[in-house]
Amino acid sequence: EFRSLARKWINANAPKEFEQELSKSSLGRIRLAKHDMVEVGKAWQKKKSDGGWACLHWPKEYGGRGATPIERVIWQQEEGVYGKLTQPFQIGEGMCGPTVMAWGSEEAKRRYLPKLASGEEIWCQLFSEPSAGSDVAGLRTRAEKKGDNWVVNGQKIWTSGAHYSDYGLLIARTDPNVPKHKGLTMFFLDMKSPGVEVRPIKQANGMQEFNEVYFTDVVIPDSQR
């Protein structure tokens, strides 16, 4: 029953004008980029949200459907190539959103999660650094407490989608005097904050999916950790 409902909705609402391009895998994505993939993705995400098909496994009160893991897999099978359209939302839906859901305040959940689910806002994660990839504990980006705020200085790299993201999850070192796997704190921040500089990395295939991100005296409220 769930599969037939999903299939019926997708057949009636999917942007079929992109089906041929999307079926060509990465080459299709390069060609689709001429249409502004982020804006096309936002439109598809909003349509899914309006129909009750966005972020299926999330609770309904945060913009999801309350679906089971099996139903989520069925949806992904039925969505097929159109799932590529929402690539800009994959990190937000799969990583950032669930983190806010698990550790954020109720106010933060109700403010940010529905807008992520509806396609209005995009999130990225700011973990890797030039000296900290697989071992994130080697990171050097610092956050220092000043009153009710934290001031962040440092650099991240290989950040997918930072150049079009509205918000990001950031891990920074808040206590340099303890073993490296301790003294780390996670924040979320507005990517348009003063002191945030995003530099896209041009890839050999012509695309720019990854970025360097620099933080210079970026102020983050204590309520965003």
Predicted regions and their residues:
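Buried hydrophobic positions in well-ordered alpha/beta secondary-structure cores of metabolic enzymes
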Residues: 10, 52, 59, 75, ...
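Glycine-rich phosphate/pyrophosphate-binding beta-alpha loops
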Residues: 132-134, 157-162, 204-205
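A short core secondary-structure module
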Residues: 140, 148-149, 153-199
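A short, charged helix-loop
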Residues: 149, 216-225
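Amphipathic, small/basic residue-rich leader segments at the start of a protein or domain
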Residues: 1-90, 107-118, 122
